[in-house]
Structure formats: C-alpha cells, structure tokens
Amino acid sequence: MLKELKLLDGKTWDYNELLDEMLKDDFYYGYLGKAALSSSSLKKLLQSPKAYQSSLTESQTETKALREGKLIHLLLLEPHKEEILTVVPVKSRTAKAYKDAAAIDGPENTFTETEYMAAKRVAKAVKSCPEAWEMIYGAATEVPVAGNIMGLPFRAKADILH
C-alpha cells in the first residue's frame, strides 16, 4: 500500500494524512486542485495546455445545470452540509437580497428559494424510489483516494461506495 505521495508542488505527504485532509472541500478543491491531477484537469489538458493553465489560475464559469446538480448532490449525498447553505426568499439571482447574501456567504453556498425547492423536489423523488434509495442509504459518500498514474499524482472522490 502507498505510504507517501509526492504532489506536483514537490511536497511529500503521508498517504493517510493526505486522505484525511481530502475530506475537507477547501483542501480538496483548493490546494489539491493545483497540486494533483484529476479527471477534470485531464479534460482541460486534452483541450490544450493553455486551457489547463487557465483552470488553475482563473475562476471557472458555473453553468445552471452544474449549479443545480451540485445542490441535488449535496442534498442527497452530503445532507449534513445543508446547514451551510443560505436560501434567499427570492425567485431570481438578480435580486438585490440574493446578491447581498452571495457577497457574504459566497455564491457557491447561496441559492434562491426557487432553486432550493426545485432541488429538494428532485432529492425527495430519488428518496421515494426504492431502487435508487437502496443504493444511497447507508453507503459511504465522498470517499477520497489518491495515487500515482504513470508517475504523476492524481486525486479523486467516489460519490458513493457500497
């Protein structure tokens, strides 16, 4: 089994310590997003080296579908994180109240009531489907793993494992 992993920044990590840190979103998407490769970074590399470099230095545009998907994912697989969300009782993200809340709590954690309720309906529908809920209930979620592929450090998180 892997005992240590050397990352792209040259730092060597104890494997178990790295896995523990990977449970923290700020570490996983922040530091490790630049210090290790992932399937997402490989997609950017396949586009061009410039696209990869831009993904490291520039904020990425979040599509409506990705934003909705992240919220549904959180509600189903990480319900303990629901408490970090700010739900603003407006219909549009162009509303002043939404913009004010997003400036304080971050746009990634701020949703309109309309967005939130739509995601809650989808999550409820999934939970109401016995076949789907059986796959989710009691499973381990957001399970981190790291390792070397062809001598390069990679990171990943399994959404769900039974």
Residues of each region from the PLM?
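Metal-dependent nuclease catalytic cores that hydrolyze phosphodiester bonds in DNA/RNA
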Residues: M1-K157
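Active-site beta-strand-loop-beta-strand hairpin of nuclease catalytic cores
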Residues: D159-H162
